[in-house]
Amino acid sequence: MALLWQNLFRRLGSKPDKPTKEAPDLYYNIAPIDATGAIYRLIVGQRSNGKTYSVCKHIVEDYFNEDKRGAYIRRYEESITPKNLQSLFNPHLQLIWELSEHKWNAVFYRAKEFHFCAIDSEGKIIAKDDTAFCITAAINTSENTKGEDRGEVHTIVFDEFMTRSGYLNNEFVRFMNLLSTLIRDRENAVVYMLANTVNKYCPYFAEMGLKNIDKLAQGEIAVYTYGSSDLTVAVELCDEVQATKKTASKYFAFDNPQLQMITRGAWEFQIYPRPPYKILQEDIVLKFYIQFAEQLLACEVVHSTMKQYCNDVFIFVHPQTKDINVDDFTIMYVSDFSSCRMHVRFLKDQPTEGHKLIYSLIQRKAVCFSDNDTGEVFRNWLQEMQGVKLW
């Protein structure tokens, strides 16, 4: 049987899962965030640090030790096809073999269900567990199965909940509806939300009332409570792990700040344009403000008074660090409805010539920033609030 076991691993292209004393230091350790007892556990860190590995291992152990099932969620249906998910639990095949007392040596995935199974040396399934230990679902198609009871689940995983390429319309509410379908009236479910450090202004943070996420230090866990409610949310910004250090220093040590997400787990950002010259007070022809994700951006339409730059017209964006009194005559882009004519939610709302000018300059990408972090706020505002992708 030992020879069959090794042959199966060679055929599956997966190494046996042999935990060692060094494992918690080499890869991400789920124990600290589990110790919080939070209902929602958000784990954010560098790529390939073991986030998904750790939670999937937890699902396997929960099934064998406590007879509890799991659920794996992604944003899009295409991400949960057999082609993309068949090998999700392969790193844990030896653990499965041991916990099942040598009954199961593989995992079978079909019809959005993972089952333990036994395969022979030819790779044929000779026995299968009738009960799925983990089911899958996608947010973008969840309305099709709304109200369907797929059985009790305990550990729910939303993998890659953050993205730089845009979110579904009303995604947070759709995610909550999907959770409602999975959890139903059961009170023992735990929700893990996993992501790489790709976007510190993710809309989930605002929707869940998670403040100062950008202030978290690596290795820190913040726990949020909600008044007298039993709801708790823990957010962990993963510390750098040993397993990725050597690869990172060998392949990704170029002098590019964007690569720090890969090398150290730092937040990813782009390099945004800076003003081409010093902006004088007399160059500013219009001021407006953008309110987004607990941030207030001050924006200035600049038309240079210098002869050599007299044709330049652009928007300069920087953080508004001081308190201001915004009157009804100031252009402001807000997150919620306002009865003030000058305060609008969308760029397409253009009640004045000033609004039209702002829209035109943004369309032409005639925008520069005080720093990259401000550029990230602006980019996310454009993408999430305006449905516009320029960077």
PLM regions with names:
Residues 2-391:
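Phosphate/NTP-binding elements of NTP-utilizing enzymes
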